[in-house]
């Protein structure tokens, strides 16, 4: 009975697969939105202000960052929770090397980068945004920054504790051998 339950739980990991496919669909939507912005700007290029152009470019950068975040979550999540990808020759260098903690750190760093781009966009349009909203944008951004820094710090502490424990165990093993 126990083996059947464990097998069912193990097989249930495939239930997350449609969610990763959904993220692939979101990536397609982001690609369409990216090129919509690019095609929108082409006819306007000689008439748009410099700050308007910068705002469009910031929007494009925002889309690229979110797309990269989606790819990272899809690939590393699939490899960590479903199955290893058997891709010869075209495999990305970081695939298979990211554990859950490094994924969390990468995701939080990407969120901070996305928030930074959004905050820069808000600062470029301060005349359209109330001071109260700007303050809230800054508070939210700082919350992301502090959270990302805190998670990275905790991850570093955990890794140093693991390394310290590993060294202590190897010292004890070596003493017993003597």
From Swiss-Prot:
It comes from the Bacteria. GO terms for cellular component: plasma membrane. Signal peptide: none annotated. The chain crosses the membrane at residues 14-34, 53-73, 136-156. It holds the Pfam family UPF0114. The keyword DNA-binding does not apply. It is found in: Cell membrane. It is a multi-pass membrane protein. InterPro entries: UPF0114, UPF0114_bac. Keywords: Cell membrane, Membrane, Plasmid, Transmembrane, Transmembrane helix. Belongs to the UPF0114 family. This is UPF0114 protein in repA1-repA2 intergenic region.
């Amino acid at each position: 009975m126990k083996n059947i339950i464990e097998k069912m739980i193990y097989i249930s990991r495939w239930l997350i697969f449609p969610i990763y496919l959904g993220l692939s669909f979101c990536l397609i939507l982001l690609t369409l939105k990216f090129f919509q912005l690019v095609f929108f700007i082409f006819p306007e290029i000689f008439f748009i202000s410099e700050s308007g152009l910068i705002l469009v470019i910031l929007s494009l950068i925002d889309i690229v960052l979110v797309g990269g975040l989606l790819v990272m979550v899809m690939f590393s999540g699939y490899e960590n929770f479903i199955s290893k990808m058997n891709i010869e020759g075209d495999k990305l260098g970081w695939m298979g090397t990211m554990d859950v903690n490094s994924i969390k750190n990468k995701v939080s760093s990407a969120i901070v980068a996305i928030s930074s781009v959004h905050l820069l966009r808000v600062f470029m349009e301060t005349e359209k945004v109330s001071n109260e909203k700007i303050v809230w944008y800054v508070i939210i951004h700082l919350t992301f920054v502090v959270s990302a820094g805190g998670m990275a710090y905790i991850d570093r502490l955990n890794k140093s504790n693991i390394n310290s424990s590993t060294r202590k165990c190897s010292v004890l093993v070596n003493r017993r051998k003597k």
